Amino acid sequence: MTDNINKESTTTTTTIDHTTNLLIDKHVEYIVKLGSKKDSFEYWVTEHIRMNGMYWGLSSLYLLKSLDKLDKNEVIQWLLSCQKSNGGFGGNTSHDDHLLSTLSAVQILIQYDALDKIDINSVVDYVVKLQREDGSFVGDQWGEVDTRFSYAAIMCLSLLKSLDKINCEKAVEYILSCQNFDGGFGSIPGAESHAGQIFTCVGALSILNEINKIDIDKLGWWLSERQLPNGGLNGRPEKSSDVCYSWWVLSALSAIDRLHWIDNDKLKSYILKCQDNETGGIADKPGDIPDVFHTFFGICGLSLMGYFKDQIESIDPVYALGTKTLQKLGLNLPWNKNL
């Protein structure tokens, strides 16, 4: 979070059972306070991904119906200070541009209905230039290739209504080349299947209306196998559960209409147990220290499963933005069951 953008929040004094209830007030307070913790280790080691952190924090507040708890103008001014001359955005004011931070910047501006604050064409040009001849995308000038970048580019251009500026056919071909025999996807061709990469590939293919080119049931089986006896989800076989996969796995299952293939109630229970009932926030595992990353994805998981409908907003499984926000943009969301 940036400095001095906190607004006064109300401290909750009532003791609530965090294993059965979502501690909304505490989570809001936790997120709002993040920007003031300049003396913490976490503040400085995450400096380079502050744009992503801002997206996670703001999106959490949106889902908790508390977006107004941060000063909109200060957030936008800080965001604009992170844009570079080539149109891309850095993770912070003093950091190089990157595709992932550029996507986060666009998502933040959309949530604030403030796309008019930037030169959209310059952002589009920046993203378009990152596509390679084989259809893949690099994340920045240094040339790393990853399916995360394909998703980020495709989603960013879709939000800016400029998908016609890239070779979508080649982009699809490259993504499909990253699919494995088990139905999952890796970061590059031949890489191990991982839930995070599956989320990006399913999301990109969904946006491009090419999800029918994969074996839905095989992928759904692989994803449903990620649920462990404790109710949580892991990202690949033989790994422990982690709240972040409540988004990576669930979003992909939701996009392919297989959300009912896992035990939603057990996952809900796992997420709630990962809440910190003293400070607020959600951790990766029960008893661990919370952070904004897992707080956001834990709330996202609960939203996707339809829990606490009266308390949290609906999120889209592909764009990772509020359903109402996307409806205002006039985007076609055939995979979203909340429409």
UniProtKB/Swiss-Prot annotation:
Keyword match 4Fe-4S: no
Phylogenetic lineage: Eukaryota, Amoebozoa, Evosea, Eumycetozoa, Dictyostelia
PFTB repeats: 24-65, 72-113, 120-161, 168-209, 216-257, 264-306
InterPro entries for this protein: PGGT1B-like (IPR045089), Prenyltrans (IPR001330), Ptb1 (IPR026873), Terpenoid_cyclase/PrenylTrfase (IPR008930)
EC code(s) of this entry: 2.5.1.60
Keyword Transferase included in the entry's annotation: yes
Family indicated by similarity: Belongs to the protein prenyltransferase subunit beta family.
GO aspect biological process, one term: endoplasmic reticulum to Golgi vesicle-mediated transport
Protein name stated in the entry: Probable geranylgeranyl transferase type-2 subunit beta
Domain of life of the native organism: Eukaryota
Catalysed reactions, semicolon-separated: geranylgeranyl diphosphate + L-cysteinyl-[protein] = S-geranylgeranyl-L-cysteinyl-[protein] + diphosphate
Gene that encodes the chain: rabggtb
